[in-house]
Amino acid sequence: SDNVKTRLAFMTNMRDGMVHNPVTGNDFDDRNDMGLRFSLDYDISDTTDLKLTYSAQKSDDKRPQEEVSFCAQDQFFGCNPRFRGGLNQAADTRGHVAGFVGFVAHLDPGTIVNKYGPSLSDKFDTLYLDREPTHLQTSEVTNLELTHDISDDVQMIAKYTYSTRDFHQTNDNDGSVSNVPLAGAGAALGLPPIEAYLCFGSSENSFCETADTDRTYDFSDVETENKQAEINFISDFDGPFNFSAGYYWYDDTTDNEYRVQTTGTQLIGSFADSPYSAVIAGL
């Protein structure tokens, strides 16, 4: 039709993982992106035009939020702030909040034990992690614009925009792997090291696994809904006087949740998950 014009564009970006995790044997830091854009221009009449634009983008891969971490272990600070330290090195548990939480959760035999040894890798393409990161993001934007010539000298422009964004990311927060067993507060009584089946994450993004060493994960969940509307009246008189008047409305709702969870935090959350719960129940 002479009074209707449309355009459609599509893109995709795919790449294999560039970093290898020897713990799981998997590669990560890949890319899997897809996007599209559709627009429609409709000449309703000689004085009225309508434009519709819709765009969407989705990413679903294993890209990290941060690539690597460096740390020079320090029993007070966790990581010595004066030195960069080694790559793929976790903080000393004795100077980290994870150590305190683990102590409260009875993971240590009396005093807090550093649960992370020396750096496991000195290569950027090889990192030892309990789990690879996950990245999922979906965003959509719809824009509607109506232009109408009220007269030869006055034009009205009305716009409305609606957009949403869902973002979910998980990371191995400590950036390394612990190989130190969780001796537990019951070690002096001859009880075996702690091992528990624990669930990490949120209602939007979670997993469960058997934990027999310390580990720290972080979870980011963001959901956004945005609405915008505006109307403008613009004059184009021949004389010295012209005007521009309008009204703008904006509404945004965002739920942003960030969690950091360790073996200790999950055991504190439910003592029934601790192997010591059966011991206490049997007393």
PLM ranges: what are they?
Residues 1-109, 141-142, 224, 228, ...:
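Transmembrane beta-barrel wall of Gram-negative outer-membrane proteins
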Residues 12, 132-133, 217-220:
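Short acidic-aromatic active-site loops that bind/stabilize oxyanions
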Residues 19-27, 64-128, 174-219, 259-283:
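Solvent-exposed loop segments that connect transmembrane elements
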Residues 59-62, 168, 254-255:
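Short catalytic/ligand-binding loop motif for oxyanion handling, primarily in non-cytosolic enzymes
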Residues 66, 134-137:
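Generic N-terminal amphipathic/basic segments
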Residues 121, 126, 166-169, 241:
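Short, solvent-exposed loop/turn elements at domain surfaces
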Residues 128-131, 139:
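Beta-sheet-rich non-transmembrane sensory/scaffold domains
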Residues 138-166, 213-283:
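Face-selective signature of the C-terminal outer-membrane beta-barrel domain
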